[in-house]
Amino acid sequence: YLIEDKKQFRSYCDTNEILYIQEKLPIDRDMRIIYVGDEVIASYWRIGGENSFKNNVAQGGVISYDNIPQDALALVDKVAKELGINHAGFDIAEVDGHYYIFEFNVFFGTRGLLNQSIKLHEIILSYLQKQTPSIPTDPYTPFPKVS
């Protein structure tokens, strides 16, 4: 949803409990970089349709596998490792040589994998099998236990 003035912004705020807001960047494409385990397994450009600011394939964008910047792949690798992410699709834009991570999400679209013969489910399963301990362990508790 593109907001172009204060009136539209107020209307958006009045009708949405949760706001997802980002600056509109001067781009006609962004990258989807898929990370599983401890590596990038796929990457591609999502190029917006004519007269659209949206690049996602589900809303008319097209896919290109040409010339994905190595710096963007390295950025995803670094961020994923620093944050302990082992499965996500990263959406990244490049503006004037700077990279902007819009989001990373475990529920990412995979249409860009169809032409690459990448079987995501097999890669995820292989990673999980390598990570599975041979003996049962206690589940990780992210918050202190309250007695």
Describe each region flagged by the PLM.
Residues I3-K6, D38-E39, F107:
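Short, hinge-like loop/turn segments at secondary-structure boundaries
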Residues D14-N16, P26-D30, I34-E39, I85:
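Short gly/pro-enriched beta-turn/loop segments at secondary-structure junctions
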Residues E39-S64:
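Glycine-rich, positively charged active-site loop/lid region within alpha/beta enzyme cores that binds
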Residues Q22, M31-I47, Y100-N105:
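Beta-strand scaffold of nucleotide-dependent catalytic cores
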Residues Y1-D28, Q70, A74:
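Active-site nucleotide/adenylate-binding loops and adjacent lid/helix of ATP-dependent enzymes
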Residues N67, K81, I85, E94-S147:
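C-terminal active-site "lid" helix and adjoining low-complexity regulatory extension at the edge
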Residues V76-V79:
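A conserved acidic, glycine/proline-rich C-terminal tail/linker
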Residues F90-I92:
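Hydrophobic residue at the +6 position relative to the catalytic HRD Asp in the kinase catalytic loop
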